[in-house]
């Protein structure tokens, strides 16, 4: 029952957004995606993204973009559930994570008073999730096994720690909030070493054109700023030219 419940919920989204649409967005870093969203949805300028520094498992990795899979965890004290219940929940979680649509990004909220006492993420979990097609993860909790974790798995978290303590799943397929980013199942998430942002489905196919426009505007400013004869007067002239770029 529990496995079927979560798999069903994980497959509920009916969207015309394809994996190719999301792959295109990985050409740009998360700050660039945020810039584009500010133009497309100006009223959402102040929220929808992480607002605290996160540690990156591998800052050199390119951005990832996928459909959210969510869960909450605790680690400071043992789970009140039986071993059988915990095993069933973990199995249900993996079924949920592997469900379509894909690709996926896992967002895990550590709900302990002091998040990160025990790490959910390490060598085993990064390899399991990568094997299930997950591109990466965002958490306010901790991660460990830095040298041994799955290469290419784009994980950003609240801290690095040595122990998994009593870490256990509390809930899955639920709304979570990680450092200001609130997400639920199948929300579209873009993430890299800078943090993560939620992309409304209606904005996905608009972003490439808006990024192109912003880039052309910024290029004029950058060329002027890097010139040997750069002055405030030249900056003012350049700023005026930007208005004519559409």
Language-model segments: residues:
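Intrinsically disordered, low-complexity regions enriched in acidic/Ser/Thr/Pro/Gln residues
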Residues: 6-87, 91-100, 219-230, 236, ...
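Conserved active-site and cofactor/substrate-binding residues in soluble primary-metabolism enzymes
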Residues: 28-32, 66, 120, 124, ...
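Buried hydrophobic positions in well-ordered alpha/beta secondary-structure cores of metabolic enzymes
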Residues: 37, 129, 187-189
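General beta-strand structural signal in soluble alpha/beta enzymes
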Residues: 47-49, 107-109, 137-141, 155-157, ...
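Short coil/turn connectors at secondary-structure junctions
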Residues: 65-66, 101-104, 133-135, 150-153, ...
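Extracellular/luminal Protease-associated
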Residues: 95-139
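Ligand/cofactor pocket segment of small-molecule handling proteins
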Residues: 126-147, 152-161, 165
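Acidic, glycine-rich flexible loop/linker segments
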Residues: 158-234
């Amino acid at each position: 029952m529990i496995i079927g419940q979560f798999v069903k919920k994980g497959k509920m989204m009916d969207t015309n957004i394809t994996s190719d649409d999301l792959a295109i967005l990985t050409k740009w870093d998360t700050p660039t995606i945020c810039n584009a969203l500010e133009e497309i949805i100006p009223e959402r300028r102040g929220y929808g993204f992480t607002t605290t520094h996160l540690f990156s498992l591998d800052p050199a990795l390119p951005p990832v973009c996928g459909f959210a899979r969510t869960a909450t965890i605790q680690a400071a004290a043992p789970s009140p559930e039986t071993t059988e219940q915990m095993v069933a929940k973990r199995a249900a979680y993996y079924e949920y994570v592997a469900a379509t649509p894909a690709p996926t990004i896992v967002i895990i909220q550590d709900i302990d008073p002091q998040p990160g006492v025990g790490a959910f993420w390490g060598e085993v979990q990064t390899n399991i999730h990568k094997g299930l097609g997950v591109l990466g993860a965002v958490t306010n909790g901790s991660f460990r096994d830095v040298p041994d974790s799955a290469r290419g798995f784009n994980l950003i978290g609240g801290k690095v720690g040595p122990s998994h303590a009593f870490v256990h799943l509390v809930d899955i397929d639920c709304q979570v909030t990680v450092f200001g980013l609130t997400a639920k199942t199948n929300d579209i998430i873009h993430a890299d070493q800078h943090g993560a942002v939620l992309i409304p489905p209606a904005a996905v196919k608009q972003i490439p054109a808006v990024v192109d426009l912003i880039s052309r505007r910024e290029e004029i400013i950058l060329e002027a700023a890097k010139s040997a004869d750069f002055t405030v007067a030249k900056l003012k002239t350049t700023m005026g030219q930007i208005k004519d770029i559409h």
